[in-house]
Amino acid sequence: MNIIRKLKPGTISLVLGPMFAGKTTFLIHCIYMLEHLEKKVVFIKSTKNTRDKTIKTHSGIQLRPKHCKIIESTQLSDVGSLTDIHAVVIDEAHFFDDLIKCRTWADEEKIIILAGLNASFEQKMFPPIVRIFPYCSWVKYIGRTCMKCNRHNACFNVRKNADKTLILAGGSELYVTCCNNCLKNTFIKQLQPIKY
């Protein structure tokens, strides 16, 4: 996989998928490749993600960059000047209501790489992802196997409890990723009502 050829200055790339699919692992890989090319990279993480204060995947892989600057923020507009940065990498992009700010950075000839969930626990796309999608020059979908049946491709994020808060950060203690068959035969019955 030579992703670097697709990552051009002035472009926005988007990686989507369900939870536990490897989106953050993919971002870490991109950061290491960009650093190898001596690009100055900033990694932006939402303060809404309260799971972990480090840059770590659900599987335990941790980001140990050489020169990457790591910023935690609630809004992208609070990040400040990125004049000396070549690439902006954003994890959990769906957490940023002002994700459209990435267009400004792309206009400044920065490489923008975003990763976010394909849908909420209600199986609806997050508004920030919907707004930025038309400006993405490259989109990658990363899937995973259903955590319930282990047979089919999973694309649905299902919350294990009845909390209806849209943004509720957590891992496998709060969420399961499942296929369509398990969603309709198991989880919809348990978690009524999921509206399409």
Curated annotation (Swiss-Prot):
InterPro entries: P-loop_NTPase (IPR027417), Thymidine_kinase (IPR001267), Thymidine_kinase_CS (IPR020633). It comes from the Viruses. ATP binds at G17, P18, M19, F20, A21, G22, K23, T24. It catalyses: thymidine + ATP = dTMP + ADP + H(+). SUPFAM superfamilies: P-loop containing nucleoside triphosphate hydrolases. Its EC number is 2.7.1.21. GO terms for molecular function: ATP binding; metal ion binding; thymidine kinase activity. One of its GO terms (biological process) is thymidine metabolic process. Substrate binds at F121, L166, I167, L168, A169, G170. Zn(2+) binds at C146, C149, C179, C182. Keywords: ATP-binding, DNA synthesis, Kinase, Metal-binding, Nucleotide-binding, Transferase, Virulence, Zinc. PROSITE patterns: TK_CELLULAR_TYPE (PS00603). Phosphorylates thymidine. ASFV replicates in the cytoplasm of infected cells and contains genes encoding a number of enzymes needed for DNA synthesis, including thymidine kinase. Important for growth in swine macrophages in vitro and is a virus virulence factor in swine. This is Thymidine kinase. The lineage of its organism: Viruses, Varidnaviria, Bamfordvirae, Nucleocytoviricota, Pokkesviricetes.
